[in-house]
Amino acid sequence: MSVTGQDNKELQQEFVIVGEPIVPGIGLGKALLLGKSSLRIRELTLPQEEVEHEISRYYKALKRSRSDLAALEKEAKGKQGYQEIASILQAHLEIIKDPLLTEEVVKTIRKDRKNAEFVFSSVMGEIEKSLCAVQKTTATRVDRVQDIHDISNRVIGHLCCQHKSSLGEFDQNLIVFSEELTPSEAANANPEYIRGFVSLEGAKTSHTAIVSLAKNIPYVANFTTELWDTIKEFSGTLVLINGDKGEITFNPQLSTIQTYYRKQASVSVTVPVQVQTGKNLPLISLSAQIVSTEELPMIERESPGTSVGLFRSEFMAFSLGRLPCVEEQADQYAQLVQFQCSDIHVLRLFDFGEDKECPCISSSHRSVRWLLEQEKVLKEQLQAIAIVSRIGRLKVLIPGVIDASEIALVKRLFQEEIRLLKGISENILWGSMIEIPSAVWMIEEILQESSFVALGTNDLAQYTLGTSRERSLLGERSRVPHPSVIRMIHHVVEQAKQKNVPVSVCGEMAGDPALLPMFLGLGVKELSAVIPAINSLKMRLLDLNSRECSRLTKQLLRAKTYEEVHQLLYV
């Protein structure tokens, strides 16, 4: 399938627009504009004798939709690094299997003798209304509403025998523009030819962003409607997308393209990255965040030598739909320990609760308190870690601690497992995740129990500012750390320096190249980011000077508002 170019000579000059960077990376291709569905749902009253046929037609559309999603999920499960995509598609399958979408729709078709498209669309509309009524406006709600739209479009498409072209069918390099890019559209995309996504609205925490990130497809979003109307005029023209800076360049000159790709090629350097300080000292190292050991070959391919700075072990349960047994865990952890790199890998204990509910255990607690409540689950995970410690060293991170007593308790339980498994020697370094304000102010005591600490910036910002974790709906502020969060990071780093305990940063902030000068100035020793962001961070590091970073950080620590921080970091 091909895309034709734009003939208007007035549109041939290089033209740049800027949105919000969602997924980092550089991509080049023709602009493909996906239009909104043109289907108009009409309300029809059916003769009584056609009602059962209409119900049969609806069941067939549901069955085809389930088959579509099941095929996508199966494909995702079979690919490295696609576990989160599979989880999202599994959630779509669960929604489409909900009795409400069968019993309620069928009941209404029979009772009112209305056509399936109209009844199904009405039911989905009611579900959307109920979501909006019970949830405040957060990116989580937006995600769920988008999931409803995605499923609704798929089923109605089958009912009306109309489907959009799959993004897996194209055979030329494209940058896809869409007002509302859905998770299943992104999941369909072939990253060999789909080189970038651009949407009118979007969020870093959205399901679409998660899919794009897993596929390593750059993504830029959030434009004004006026600017989006301008974008439509450039359908079919050559586009360069810069997911690091949020820049979209239409009709890029050859010199512009060469500059981007030359700079990108220059960052194939080993880790830790060395920053020019006059003495060429390695001030900061970059590590990878992963959800599965299937992502390890991607690290080897994209950024050789990089260690794993955060293995999010709870995603094993999401992928399996249940808690993994000791043997399954030990197999995964052994693969992690044996992966060759420049440093010791970091495994985070199961981090369940709130937005990450355990598939088979419901609890009001989260993070380490969830683990301590579910002691059997914790002991099994510690047993798997103890078994693997025979192979090599491992750093183990305890999530969401509020004080030192929780760390001491986990370590005591681990010692019990060591004693039970005779002949196994402890080969573990224990770390604490600082993501709750109480931990910031108890940091001196926490450091006494920790060989390293990791700042979880997503939750730290949420609990400090009283916001949803999905802060993208705050507009430009979603990218900007609040002065209070910057000061908290500074406090933790300063206390850790006194105890000679290394500090790493993970979360969204760690993958934002604009924040690198701040972290360098604060004295952070390691950033743990998603794999596609690592080379973008390296590119940014090549431009930095330690003295300028220190000067900037002093100004940031004096800032009093979001706006002041934004001026210093992004303008």
Curated annotation (Swiss-Prot):
Its main location: cytoplasm. InterPro entries: PEP-util_enz_mobile_dom, PEP-utilizing_PTS_enzyme, PEP_util_C, PEP_util_CS, Phosphohistidine_dom_sf, PTS_EI-like, PTS_EIN, PtsI_HPr-bd_sf. Keywords: Cytoplasm, Kinase, Magnesium, Metal-binding, Phosphotransferase system, Sugar transport, Transferase, Transport. The keyword Cell inner membrane does not apply. The active site is at 207 (tele-phosphohistidine intermediate), 506 (proton donor). Mg(2+) binds at residues 435, 459. Its EC number is 2.7.3.9. It is found in: Cytoplasm. The N-terminal domain contains the HPr binding site, the central domain the pyrophosphate/phosphate carrier histidine, and the C-terminal domain the pyruvate binding site. The reaction takes place in three steps, mediated by a phosphocarrier histidine residue located on the surface of the central domain. The two first partial reactions are catalyzed at an active site located on the N-terminal domain, and the third partial reaction is catalyzed at an active site located on the C-terminal domain. For catalytic turnover, the central domain swivels from the concave surface of the N-terminal domain to that of the C-terminal domain. This is Phosphoenolpyruvate-protein phosphotransferase. It comes from Chlamydia trachomatis serovar D (strain ATCC VR-885 / DSM 19411 / UW-3/Cx).
